Amino acid sequence: MSTNNSVLVLKVGGALLQCEMGMARLMDTAAAMIANGQQVLMVHGGGCLVDEQLAANGMETVKLEGLRVTPPEQMPIIAGALAGTSNKILQGAATKAGIVSVGMCLADGNTVSAKIKDERLGLVGEVYPKDATYLKFILSQGWMPICSSIAMMDDGQMLNVNADQAATVLAKLVGGKLVLLSDVSGVLDGKGQLIPSLNGQQIADLVKQGVIEKGMKVKVEAALEVAQWMGQAVQVASWRDASQLVALAKGEAVGTQIQP
């Protein structure tokens, strides 16, 4: 068994939860990496499940600049959908693939500190790295943490955190390599073609042109932040593409490389 001291942080989007085959393929890839000594930390969203639960309760989904607005009355439903249902669906898929996993949220183990991000967004949190002890213990056992993006302030108030930003903070905390996996193969140009590599200036230009917008804008800016902080490229790739997952397992570059 080879050992790899770096942590691979895989952020998966909520759309994965609705694709059983995609989940199985990703977990099989993660299981192979863990068996080869690679430490893997998974961070997830669950936007589609949140939308479904809110609609079932007669509540509206509102977004501002790609971020979910979270009024206090929606927080229990959002926490249940993310830290509950979404987390356990992924944990079930991990168990099926033979992975020993630990379902958790950002509030566990004093892992991050959190505060309100912007009053206009309601109970949406900004999080900061705090203590890696809990995560490092789980990883040292050969287990895979599966972390939802629910955080908590010092007064116990739950906060909803954008999952891309949550993954960024955890990657910083454990000094890991970040891969943002979604249902698209990477960042696409105006013609729908994959862009293999982007730097900060190119990202700013594409945002200005409206090519990168909404959720992808949040994702790419989070990737750029961690790339600059860690001085290494962050990958934006797809869990749908089996060839990308195989390449990922081999440690090869996949999708779009966000350069520091």
Swiss-Prot record:
Listed name of the protein: Acetylglutamate kinase
Top-level class of the enzyme under EC nomenclature: transferase
E.C. designation(s): 2.7.2.8
Cited function: Catalyzes the ATP-dependent phosphorylation of N-acetyl-L-glutamate.
GO CC annotations, alphabetized: cytoplasm
Residues binding substrate: 46-47, 68, 160
Listed GO MF terms: acetylglutamate kinase activity; ATP binding
Record flagged with keyword Oxidoreductase: no
Residues under site feature: Transition state stabilizer: 11, 219
Swiss-Prot/TrEMBL catalytic activity: N-acetyl-L-glutamate + ATP = N-acetyl-L-glutamyl 5-phosphate + ADP
Pfam families, sorted: AA_kinase
SUPFAM superfamilies reported in the protein's UniProt record: Carbamate kinase-like
Pathway(s) it belongs to: Amino-acid biosynthesis; L-arginine biosynthesis; N(2)-acetyl-L-ornithine from L-glutamate: step 2/4
Alphabetical UniProt keywords: Amino-acid biosynthesis, Arginine biosynthesis, ATP-binding, Cytoplasm, Kinase, Nucleotide-binding, Transferase
Organism encoding this protein: Shewanella oneidensis (strain ATCC 700550 / JCM 31522 / CIP 106686 / LMG 19005 / NCIMB 14063 / MR-1)
Localization annotation: Cytoplasm
Gene: argB
One annotated GO biological process: arginine biosynthetic process via ornithine
InterPro entries to which the protein is assigned, alphabetical: AceGlu_kinase-like_sf, AcgluKinase_fam, ArgB, Asp/Glu/Uridylate_kinase
HAMAP family from the UniProt entry: ArgB (MF_00082)
